[in-house]
């Protein structure tokens, strides 16, 4: 269902929001043109009715999520979902795995060197794997969230920035300013030779 990243409905590499938007939506038949339309006249968006009914689709999704049960979610799980290729496609999985394995080696090695007990070292290694994976996962997610926020701020800054290339330069005004400057008598220089 919605919480399992490998369900049959999910496509790899496509966020859930995009998949919901790409889901088939009931489209209305072609709308008749407004009564005040004349051939060749441009139609404005405000003159037409919306193509999609956003209220019903949101309520349908809410009803579908309410009906989701653990049994329905379990039916979507397959053995292929646990392949290394699919797991490597999950964002932050690699970083979490590397941090977990590093923590496992460090915790297991230090415990083994200190206590000389392989069972105890293995237990601490597994604990280090779990804890390191969680820390690596959360750290990667935080970095991704921050980078997405920076990218969004950059997008907003570029959108709000004035685009000088859209204005045509007024060459006549510039030429007039240059000619006026050349017509003025030369000013007395600020320096003086003696």
From Swiss-Prot:
Region (Disordered): 1-40
Keyword match Transit peptide: yes
Any matching Pfam family: Cox20
Transmembrane portions of the chain: 96-115, 120-137
GO terms assigned for molecular function: unfolded protein binding
Keywords: Membrane, Mitochondrion, Mitochondrion inner membrane, Transit peptide, Transmembrane, Transmembrane helix
Any GO CC annotation of this UniProt entry: mitochondrial inner membrane
The keyword Nucleotide-binding belongs to this UniProt entry's keyword annotation: no
Topology versus the membrane: Multi-pass membrane protein
Mitochondrial matrix side: 116-119
An annotated GO BP: negative regulation of programmed cell death
Domain of life: Eukaryota
Mitochondrial intermembrane-side positions: 138-194
Compartmental location: Mitochondrion inner membrane
Low complexity bias (residue ranges): 14-30
Assigned protein family: Belongs to the COX20 family.
Biological role: Involved in the assembly of the cytochrome c oxidase complex.
Record protein name field: Cytochrome c oxidase assembly protein COX20, mitochondrial
Gene: COX20
